[in-house]
From Swiss-Prot:
GO molecular function: actin filament binding
Protein name (Swiss-Prot/TrEMBL): Ponticulin-like protein C3
The UniProt record lists the keyword Cell membrane: yes
Location(s), subcellular: Cell membrane
Entry similarity comment: Belongs to the ponticulin family.
Species whose genome carries this gene: Dictyostelium discoideum (Social amoeba)
Gene symbol of the encoding locus: ponC3
Membrane-related topology note: Lipid-anchor; GPI-anchor
Length: 147
């Protein structure tokens, strides 16, 4: 019985801390090729969501066996600003939430853009959520030790 309660409290703490992760509303792709229509206007993929910087990007496939390399899907109808898009065989490597890699003769830069569109949250809400998650985790740990 004590083990079940401890396990339940630990699951609650882990769930609370996972909800505190920063979310991203979109990511931008810029292109260094002077002949590309992307060079003056960044490709803004608003339909995509970065779950974490270089962690998991919707419509971008992770390379097997790597947590930092991703392959682009065809942007297709999602992309209205740029006709010249990379194919699914092209890769980029993330470093600290930003990435630049030469694909052929073109360098693509990928940057995750934090989601600040929720009007009920202020800029300080991230630190508040992290603090609350830490407090929940500490409470769960103390409860487990008391059992």
């Amino acid at each position: 019985m004590k083990f079940t309660k401890s396990l339940l409290l630990l699951i609650v703490a882990v769930f609370a801390s996972s909800n505190a992760a920063e979310t991203f509303s979109n990511f931008q792709v810029t292109n260094s090729d002077a002949n590309s229509p992307c060079v003056t206007t960044p490709v803004e993929l608003k339909v995509n969501t970065c779950q974490s910087a270089c962690g998991s990007i919707l419509n971008v496939l992770p390379v097997t066996g790597s947590t930092s390399k991703f392959t682009f899907n065809q942007f297709g109808a999602q992309d209205t600003k740029c006709a010249a898009t990379p194919t699914s065989s092209n890769e980029f490597t993330c470093v600290d939430g930003k990435s630049k890699v030469a694909i052929g003769s073109t360098t693509y830069s990928v940057v995750c853009v934090p989601d600040k569109t929720n009007s009920s949250e202020s800029d300080s809400s991230d630190s508040t959520r992290i603090g609350a998650s830490f407090a929940l985790f500490a409470l769960a740990l103390l409860s487990m030790l008391a059992l």
